[in-house]
């Protein structure tokens, strides 16, 4: 009887905390960035360019935090959050590559930009890992590893899609905008 009550109490507690954990996930984009993304919904090159710029901004913020001795107190938490945002942006880039690629929408310029940026990001993340104080690195090493893997995945998917797009372009089978796609 007592064991059943404990299990029931544990179940109720778990169910009541589940929505709290789910609501803690942050949107990596601010309101202005979201509006910018909406404006270019039919233009994959521009979307990839924007998202790449947003991701570069997160990396630049991480580099500024790392160099600022005044931010030492809460720097690990801020870097952790920025790395999570960066990884979410890369996941969004991958989703866009998949979506626009499946509809044969031309995004070769954006893919090239993403591939170039991926090389930069790999170097910047490696530098962060090497130069971070060990006591700080321990607080965000997991998300740093996730971010590094996400960069590798994004670069690989962008390269594959660019190759596919180049082949489709030879046969003139690419749509200029997403709205031209055959449904």
Where are the regions that the model predicts?
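Bacterial N-terminal signal peptides
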Residues: 8-16
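Long, charged/polar, soluble alpha-helical segments
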Residues: 22-183
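Bacterial N-terminal signal peptides that target proteins for export
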Residues: 1-9
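Bacterial Sec-dependent signal peptides at the C-terminal "C-region" and cleavage site
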Residues: 3, 15-25
